[in-house]
Amino acid sequence: MADPGTVKCARGVRVSAAVVGCAVLFVLAACSSGRGANNVSEPSDVAVGECVEVREADGSSTVEATRTDCDTDEMTFVATQIATGECGDYENYLTFPDTKDRLCLMPNYADGQCYQIPQSSGGSLVDFTNIECEGTPVTGAGIYRVESSGDGSIECAADQVKATYDKPEARAFCLTSLSDA
């Protein structure tokens, strides 16, 4: 039996191992840099009309946001404006350290889908979630189904809530409450 320190590999095996090793490192680098490149750390990291996904940051009361595709199945928000003051009615916002600017956001609702929506000013962006229509909302939130959407002139039924956004372009959603919140 050969001494393990002197076992020789065929040249092709060493080249293949090197190629596989480089490929793994490339994929890892691409994945980590892609996520970092999409992190939102200031309002100007997102263009008006782009979407962001918001999640809780390490179990704390702060949130993290990343740019994402607007057509994802996850709950996303559309950046509507960067404001130094208040955002519009129904708009939510993100604040950032070292700036007074706010990134104003509109929920990116899809017709026919149900969402958990916070009902009080103490709610968080992470409380907005896609949810089963028969689901149970967290305390302080309600479940709403998006019946229809369109420009600001859309008419909603009397028993529906009309959420209207003016920026980046007129958009309105007709929502039916499915819970007692």
Where are these regions (language model features)?
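C-terminal motif of bacterial Sec signal peptides marking the signal peptidase cleavage site
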Residues: 27-30
